[in-house]
């Protein structure tokens, strides 16, 4: 069985194509969204999702989140004395989703179509694929998030040619894509984005407003108090979309700090973020050679697009109401599930050709002559420019720059800077050329880039026909099949908590967190209910556990209100 997975910065989802069409698969807690949070305790137990999120309130050093931002890098996260790479943490999310899907579907899940941001470069895509492999999933196909959203909205079934812009503002990343449908082909025309802009930034604005109004300083708060502040700011951010003002409260020791924040104040403080949002929109339109008026439809995906401050801004910007038929949190996962069905050649799904673009420019280092006989080295020569539809193959002819030069070195680079040193080095190829006066020998440098992110570099000496090729599959941190297998064995000691224990652990963690926040009689009441629940867990009698859990849940919900 092939499933579709939206591996998000803030939340992740799994979906499958069933007889009823694409459906979101609920996790073991019965919810569609699984927070992309992982916690590992000192005994090697892994907690994923809400349970890990609750542990962050109590054991912040054992929890990692937003690690999608570091995919494809060498960064490691230290959880309870154990080090993990971003793809290893992502694999734990994927394992969790895989288990839930198998229980829901009643069959083994062997493969997944995983969504990635359109601007993810080769390193990040390879890291995502490795995460799937570490989770025991075959990942042959990845789909860009905007394309997945367009598929979910059914735009590929439209009868007429259409241009549309997909606006994806998630918890931690921002992505703008312009797509065009013509003759049953869904083509990505341009992408732009910001890897460090998302709903979390709008939460930070709310947090800063609260600190300003209460005279508090973030650095003076303990780590647990900072976590509580963020949680309260997140709740206020969501609440203010439906109100003209919200009241934030934060218990610090025995003092309850309170501040009222109006919608007008919040909108004014968000102005800088909205201006940052505008830039990728302008860039994507410019790269596609289009104006705002050329866009037929605007689609919203990502949970942060629910914010009224964001939606109002977009209505003013595009002078039209965006399409909001689908749940913005679920559209990408549903599209990935439809793509999985296409891969399986399911007859219920109309086949459509999905094209993607090269997110970053690929080129090489060259020497340029800026005056007669004066040269400057270290310059960047683009060969396949960003937002070129892939698969693509382009050739540049380059010449020798010195008399009696007998070798040409082709350094393969990725980036947008004029200077080679500022771009990402991918590989290098050297080839012999006949000696002669400078400029007398030429080489054809051909880059071929396919939809699976494989880059083939071919260098051909024009005079002799000598040809050399190299294929760039990944970067220095690419793992071999043997290394992946070895790491899977090393990670096998980490056990995701059994499904039937998840709800009990989550309730207990919530209760412990609220106990720490409470005072006086409220704290005593919580202690009494927690003790009863813990006693029921020790006895192991299902009916007693359910009764005690329900009673504890009731007072926890009263506290949350």
Question: What spans do the regions from the language model cover?
Answer:
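Oxyanion-binding/catalytic loops of NTP- or PPi-dependent enzymes
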Residues: 1-73, 77-83, 92, 99-561
């Amino acid at each position: 069985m092939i499933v579709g997975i939206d591996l998000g910065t803030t939340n992740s989802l799994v979906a499958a194509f069933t007889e009823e069409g694409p459906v979101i698969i609920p996790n073991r807690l019965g919810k569609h969204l699984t927070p992309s949070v992982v916690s590992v305790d000192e005994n090697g137990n892994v907690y994923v999702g809400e349970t890990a999120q609750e542990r962050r309130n109590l054991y912040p050093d054992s929890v990692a989140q937003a690690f999608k931002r570091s995919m494809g890098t060498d960064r490691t996260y230290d959880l309870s004395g154990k080090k993990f790479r971003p793809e290893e943490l992502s694999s734990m999310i994927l394992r969790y989703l895989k288990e839930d899907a198998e229980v829901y579907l009643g069959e083994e899940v062997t493969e997944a179509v995983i969504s990635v941001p359109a601007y993810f470069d080769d390193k990040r895509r390879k890291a995502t694929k490795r995460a799937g492999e570490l989770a025991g999933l075959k990942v042959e196909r990845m789909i860009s998030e905007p394309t997945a959203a367009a598929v979910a909205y059914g735009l590929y079934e439209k009868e007429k040619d259409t241009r549309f812009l997909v606006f994806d503002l998630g918890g931690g990343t921002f992505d703008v894509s312009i797509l065009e449908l013509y003759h049953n082909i869904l083509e990505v025309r341009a992408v732009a984005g910001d890897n460090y802009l998302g709903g979390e930034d709008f939460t930070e604005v709310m947090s800063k407003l609260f600190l300003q109004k209460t005279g508090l300083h973030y650095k003076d708060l303990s780590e647990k108090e900072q976590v509580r502040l963020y949680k309260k700011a997140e709740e206020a951010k969501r609440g203010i979309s439906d109100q003209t003002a919200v009241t934030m409260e934060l218990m610090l020791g025995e003092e309850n700090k309170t501040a009222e924040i109006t919608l007008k104040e919040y909108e004014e403080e968000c102005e800088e973020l909205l201006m940052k949002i505008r830039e990728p929109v302008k860039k994507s339109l410019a790269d596609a050679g289009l104006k705002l008026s050329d866009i037929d439809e605007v689609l919203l995906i990502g949970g942060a697009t629910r914010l009224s401050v964001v939606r109002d801004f977009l209505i003013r910007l595009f002078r039209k109401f965006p399409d909001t038929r689908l749940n913005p949190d679920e559209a990408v996962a549903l599209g990935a599930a439809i793509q999985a069905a296409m891969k399986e050649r399911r007859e219920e799904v109309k086949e459509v050709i999905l094209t993607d673009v090269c997110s970053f420019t690929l080129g090489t280092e060259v020497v340029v002559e800026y005056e007669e006989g004066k040269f400057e080295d270290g310059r960047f020569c683009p060969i396949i420019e960003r937002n070129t539809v892939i698969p693509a193959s382009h050739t540049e002819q380059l010449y020798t720059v010195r008399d009696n030069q007998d070798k040409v070195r082709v350094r393969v680079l990725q980036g947008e800077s004029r200077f080679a040193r500022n771009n990402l080095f991918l590989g290098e190829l050297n080839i012999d050329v006949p000696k002669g006066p400078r400029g007398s020998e030429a080489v054809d440098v051909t880059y071929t880039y396919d939809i699976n992110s494989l880059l083939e570099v071919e260098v051909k000496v024009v005079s002799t026909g000598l040809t050399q090729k190299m294929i760039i599959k990944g970067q220095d941190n690419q793992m071999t099949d043997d290394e992946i297998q070895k790491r899977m064995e090393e990670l096998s000691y980490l056990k995701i908590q059994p499904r039937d224990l998840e709800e009990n652990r989550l309730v207990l963690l919530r209760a412990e967190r609220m106990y720490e926040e409470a005072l006086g009689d409220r704290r005593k009441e919580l202690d009494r209910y927690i003790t009863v629940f813990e006693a029921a867990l020790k006895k192991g009698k299902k009916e007693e556990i359910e009764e005690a859990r329900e009673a504890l849940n009731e007072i926890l919900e009263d506290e949350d209100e």
